[in-house]
Amino acid sequence: MSNNYDSSSIKVLKGLDAVRKRPGMYIGDTDDGTGLHHMVFEVVDNSIDEALAGYCKDIVVTIHEDNSVSVSDDGRGIPTEMHPEEKVSAAEVIMTVLHAGGKFDDNSYKVSGGLHGVGVSVVNALSEKVLLTIYRGGKIHSQTYHHGVPQAPLAVVGETERTGTTVRFWPSAQTFTNIEFHYDILAKRLRELSFLNSGVSIKLTDEREEDKKDHFMYEGGIQAFVTHLNRNKTPIHEKVFHFNQEREDGISVEVAMQWNDGFQENIYCFTNNIPQRDGGTHLAGFRGALTRTLNNYMDKEGFSKKAQAATSGDDAREGLTAVVSVKVPDPKFSSQTKDKLVSSEVKSAVESAMNEKLADFLAENPSEAKNVCSKIIDAARAREAARKAREMTRRKGALDLAGLPGKLADCQEKDPALSELYIVEGDSAGGSAKQGRNRKNQAILPLKGKILNVEKARFDKMLSSQEVATLITALGCGIGRDEYNPDKLRYHNIIIMTDADVDGSHIRTLLLTFFYRQMPELIERGYIYIAQPPLYKVKKGKQEQYIKDEEAMNQYQVALAMDGAELHVNADAPALAGEPLEKLVQQYNAAIKLVERMSRRYPYAMLHELIYVPRINAELCADKAAVEAWTQRLVEQLNAKEVGASQYSVLVEHNAELNVYLPKIQVRTHGVTHEYLLSADLINSKEYAKLADLSEALDGLIEAGAFIKRGERVQPISSFAAALDWLIKESRRGLSIQRYKGLGEMNPDQLWETTMDPETRRMMQVTIEDAVGADELFTTLMGDQVEPRRAFIETNALKVANLDV
């Protein structure tokens, strides 16, 4: 480090260097994924601004297989003409110059989410490569950038009738710790945008996974958003309160809200379509007006006298779902990430609009107003009961030694960052865990039976539950609006350790519901983990090994089977062994797994037989006779193998749109007939290509006299599948496999070695990427309404791989 501090020490970061040097200032954290996804939102916000101005109706966001993302819209297209001052195309100025854009010229956009003119130029600076395509003036313009540097000027590459812009970018691994996009995070934001912009179609597709896509298009704006958020809950009044008011100063305030019979408060705030996670002046104005208007109404109508308990703002917001959306010509945020609105004029705008409109709503809808007031009074009484219960607990706690529950085996470490709390199912596993742990930093809390489902329980009832009270005391961070302080948490690693069966899953879900509803910050801060104890223990001779799950078990058995295996495809052929044989086995197993996954849509036997017939492709489908012959062969092989069970017959269907002939197979089982069309999508899919590749690899491989050998043992075979089955059976000789169902089956040493030793254990961190989706899932699975839960189970039942009953 130099001691010279003079004028030469002062660096001026020109162009996009500032962004690369301090990316966090522009897009948020580059390590935890928020900054990475913010890149997509910066580009999407530009398309939304086109929609706000009335020029864009369709936005398509695609996560490509190579983990790049493209955002395409049908807006006006970025201007392509030469910029009068910069002497390069306007598009290049927008892509490479900070604080350049159409948001400063008040005539181009009245209100916009883009504010500082840094959005797309930041994306360009922090991407390894950007491909810009503009459709404008009847021409297609294209330009490529590497790390923000244009490789050539904007060039015309074709003609078109459409207008719009497509930006495809590959994030830079030099900036981001992790460059993998999460579908749920993008889906959450795009869903919000589609509600906030009625009639705009937003499509999201993930090419990394089969059939993963969503189409968000909602009429009804934020009113529909509130209905969507409450759809699995029970609203206490039918009508969604909604107003949209535009003021003379250009600020427009739109609010939609509805109370449900739950106990959670859900308020979503937006400024110019951009969400404010930390609220701001619009939230303050909304809360103030809500409490004041409701209190005035309750005093006037005599509800306050009946209540016999003073109501607070928190009571008024219990069970409230609301969306507050403001449009502000020149908004001020606390940072470029726009997480908090600080424009002071917005608070009074929201307050005055809410006061007036909510008072009118309550006066015009007396029965709905009565329901809301009754709920607020109930909340106030419950809060009072909870306060008394807490005081009782505190008085009782003063008598206990250090106020910690007797069940808790605490650790010696006092630094929360180094301490771990294992929440263990049942006293027997708790005993093993207490004996096996490292006392220095591992505490154990055994929970007896199932804790209360907090989704259905009121706060005072929850506090009276013994298991919940024990858990709250052990955590040390308090609970409830007045007492809860996540900074007082005694352990920064809370590990849920339950059995690998139905009861274990249920207890884990109940605990996650508790943390999500009562202490969400613990999940947001990454303190909650789920232990992943092994499912199997295998023993061969004196060697023991723990195996985490079914997939690892299959891999272990295949590796064992390959040891010393030789495949002779005929009596005289040289042996196929080692890596070539292993690759073929892996290819076969991957295909079988694919068949199992696809068997939700087609019969397993039919898919499996595709491995043993030649490839069918688009070329073959143009010839009807060829398709008939191919289908006939498939059907004959199926009928020969499935004697008596099912009868297969041939049909061929002509697809007029594509002008191709497609195989259609009729299956008759126990007198019931079903038809299955092998569609053009299936024939052209990556999945079918993998089955066809295996078909070509196995075609003619096994000849007369073929045999498989492992060590000294030899077995004649007629198919590759028979060879693999024999090898697996052989490898199991002398192998003892134990499947663990409960943690209590392990002794303390085994529990330490497999689940508690930081060197060898596996844990899964609990995170929330899509808060709306998570809220919906907890409500569906753990709430009062049966119908949404039944629909969820019926929809997802076929996707279950292992059902433990």
Swiss-Prot record:
Disulfide bonds: none annotated. GO terms for biological process: DNA topological change; DNA-templated DNA replication. Its main location: cytoplasm. The gene is gyrB. It comes from Vibrio cholerae serotype O1 (strain ATCC 39315 / El Tor Inaba N16961). This is DNA gyrase subunit B. Mg(2+) 1 binds at residues 425, 499. It is an enzyme of class 5 (isomerase). Belongs to the type II topoisomerase GyrB family. The keyword ATP-binding applies. Its EC number is 5.6.2.2. Residues 419-534 form the Toprim domain. Its cofactor is Mg(2+); Mn(2+); Ca(2+). SUPFAM superfamilies: ATPase domain of HSP90 chaperone/DNA topoisomerase II/histidine kinase (SSF55874), Ribosomal protein S5 domain 2-like (SSF54211), Type II DNA topoisomerase (SSF56719). Few gyrases are as efficient as E.coli at forming negative supercoils. Not all organisms have 2 type II topoisomerases; in organisms with a single type II topoisomerase this enzyme also has to decatenate newly replicated chromosomes. InterPro entries: DNA_gyrase_B_C (IPR002288), GyrB (IPR011557), GyrB_hook (IPR049353), GyrB_insert (IPR041423), HATPase_C_sf (IPR036890), Ribosomal_Su5_D2-typ_SF (IPR020568), Ribsml_uS5_D2-typ_fold_subgr (IPR014721), Topo_IIA (IPR001241).
